[in-house]
Amino acid sequence: MKKKIVAIMMALSLLAAIMTPMASAASVSATKKGAALQFHQDGKFKIMMISDTQDTDKADQRMLNFINASLDQERPDLVVFTGDNIAGKWVGSTVEKVRTAIDKIIQPLVARSIPFAVVFGNHDGESKVTTKEDQMAMFMAYDNCLAIDEGEALDGVGTYNLPILSSDGSRVAFNVYMMDSNDYDENGNYDGVHQNQIEWYEQTGNALKAENGGEPVPSLLFQHIPVPQIYHLLKEVPFGVIGSVRGYGTRSLKWYVVDETKAEGNVKEGPCCCYKDHGQYASWLKQGDIAGAFFGHDHTNNMVGKTDDGITLGYNAGCGFNLYGDGLNRSMRMFVID
């Protein structure tokens, strides 16, 4: 039975937050410590997406209140952090401060025994005292962490997948890809997923397909930096149109608004996608398994839509308060797979 995905954007104002009470490259990744993900008997599975917490060892209490309140309200089966999890070069001068910054955002999940997965953004690796490998080891030390450091097999740190079993446990009914979109290219522009990561994705998808009787396993994909095709959900308008945003990179002399025939939500800054098209989107079309791909990175963008090719792309705006954002609003995105 084909799974249906319902994406729900959650946004709380500052007032609401304050008032709330407190593997090998070709193989399918296995969840850690035997904690298999599985659909409930009612056929549902809930994923919460948290983006750009981007704080220090002295995490803003408003963010922590928001995380706690959202977990209690939605009761997700899995939480995915999509990068810029700590404030990078601002997090502090000791390894212990980095560890504490990570612990601040993970303890709400530990307290509720909720599994989580994580990818990195462009700021995580800017820490002066830890590498992304160091940070991944810190995340993986938690019993409820399903993230995997794939080692030297692939570029980046933390490209893996999480199969979700059917209600009866007999097969993989759904899949989640977690992709490291790296940080900056050789020219200082935003990077993206590299070729060997794309090859890994295709090999993994083919392995899942073979186990599923030759049919692609429907999947969600999460990464920090958007693909350039996010612009397919926008339309170009003349300079000066109210609500328009300036494009990024090769589109920096153009202005855009949300194309309401394809997408809904808001875009309050030009999408800062990877500067070069690495072929990731084309690979999704070829494989036919990506039901939706969702990104963080641009803190004030909260849009979701479907391209003419039939792939759903979307943003989740920032969660943290120690960064720029949409006034006092902060966001999380919920996915109910049914």
Give, region by region, the residue ranges found by the protein language model.
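Binuclear metal-dependent phosphoesterase catalytic core
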Residues: G34, N161, L165, G265-N266, ...
